[in-house]
Amino acid sequence: MSTLQLKETKVPSVQFVGDDDVLSHILDREGGTKLKKEKAQLLVNPQKVIKKADCELEKSDLEVLEDQNYVKVLGRNIQESLGNGSAKDGRNKVYSFQQRKHPEEMTKLALELAKTSGKKDPLDSNDPEITKNIAQKSKGHSTSEKAPLVNNNKTEFLSTQPHNLRKRIIASRSHYDSESEYSASSSEDDEEATKDEEEDTNVARLSQKSQGQNRLLPAPVSKETLPKKKKRDKASDLVEEYFEAHSSSKVLTSDRTLQRLRRARVDQKTLHNLLRKFVPSFSAEIERLNQQHEKLFHKWMLQLHLGFNIVLYGLGSKRDLLEKFRTTMLQDSIHVVINGYFPGVSVKSILNSITEDVLSHVGTFQSVLDQRDWIINRFKEDSSLELFLLIHNLDSQMLRGDNSQQILGQLSSLHNVYLIASIDHLNAPLMWDHAKQSLYNWLWYETTTYSPYTEETSYENSLLVKQSGSLPLSSLIHVLRSLTPNARGIFRLLMKFQLDNQDSPSYIGLSFQDFYQQCREAFLVNSDLTLRAQLTEFRDHKLIRTKKGTDGVEYLLIPVDSGILADFLEKEEEEA
């Protein structure tokens, strides 16, 4: 009995099952669990689906079909496509993302878009199949891979961008890219931004794709902040480099000067002999150039007699050229040569040479202006008198004064006085205004000689030449002009006292107390401290020298030649 019962239990029972039950049983047994664990939802490639559409459909029909079926196909038949794609084709690998917190947002979005488009919504939010498909779609949302969906050799059409909205989509995308280089929104912010747009689902899908790609980029940074940060970093680097460059306390100025050369300085005569032995490599060219200038001598003589005066300019010393003109053309004429580069030259010395050597006048004049008027009247009275004035360096330091140029211009304006001069300074024409230009009545000649300024620079201070120790007149004038009027008055008192006692053999200088008393009486100082401060400045410029006598008294002395001091006083009186 027990054996029969066991056999009866082992007999299989037969039951009729439908095709749907068989299909669900196969999916549960073979791929159902794997689908839930390993596979994520495959995204739909609208472009590939459209390419597999019926060839008989035209482009315009496809666009109408896409506009009409966009909401209908949203969320439908996703489960079937997943089953086909995962079971049959193993090449489509999709990586799953975390489940969204609000999976029903896509359904609400579809309903709102259907209402705004004015079409009847074919979707029902209460349909469990639609809700399930949309939820699965939100879980498997990805833009990395796209695959076509095939179900029983039937192609399902999904929507693409409508033709009439294509331009607006491109414009919105370009505007979006111009506003921000990177996207800073999360998945929840993307859904909220999609609800705010509510213009077209294609625009929403396009923004979702761009946002999904931008999630792989680094932290969001605004375009406007990047240049500011770069500028700040660059400015900070420049500041650091500046302080690093100036952090060293070492002085980089070199002290290798000519004074460090332990060689005895030569005198002026030895220097002249050395310079004469030097022969330039282009001496033949210089000789030809001088010959061209010498051909103009007769022309210059003609223009001088026509009432013009001649000024020579150009690179190089013109002393030899004027000397050649004097020896060639002025042998039988009365002429006076004036070396303007000489430190002791002045208008007074020029007028003295004319009155004493040319006009043979014996006597003195009250002022330089009286002497000038006497010379002008003498040449006007005797028209047979002719005088040639040759001035080297008319623009020298001693002759460039306004009074000196005015007197020389008045002499050159006489019809029987002929002037030929040379200038070397670049700004020499600035000495003459329109009035002086009309007095001189210049004819300009460019006479470049390329000769060295040997004689012109022989009276200047040099580190190579040993000087006598006394200041030349030009240096004395230059130093005193830089002082205050009180300082010049103090120095003038000491200079007059020294000139008055220059013939005394026992003169050793002016004592400090006597000098202070004279300055106090002239209202130049009010205390001995002020006088000592001024004497310190004179001592720095090497204008005075102090020494103590046998009685311990301090004496003051000017280490300048008496002739230079006398010329300086005359020049001061002329300018006064």
Curated annotation (Swiss-Prot):
Involved in LRWD1-binding repeats: 1-100
One example of a Gene Ontology biological process annotation: DNA replication initiation
Gene Ontology molecular function, alphabetical: DNA replication origin binding
In-chain residues carrying the UniProt-annotated modification Phosphothreonine: 116, 225
Annotated PANTHER family: ORIGIN RECOGNITION COMPLEX SUBUNIT 2
Protein family membership: Belongs to the ORC2 family.
Protein name: Origin recognition complex subunit 2
Organism: Mus musculus
Lineage: Eukaryota, Metazoa, Chordata, Craniata, Vertebrata
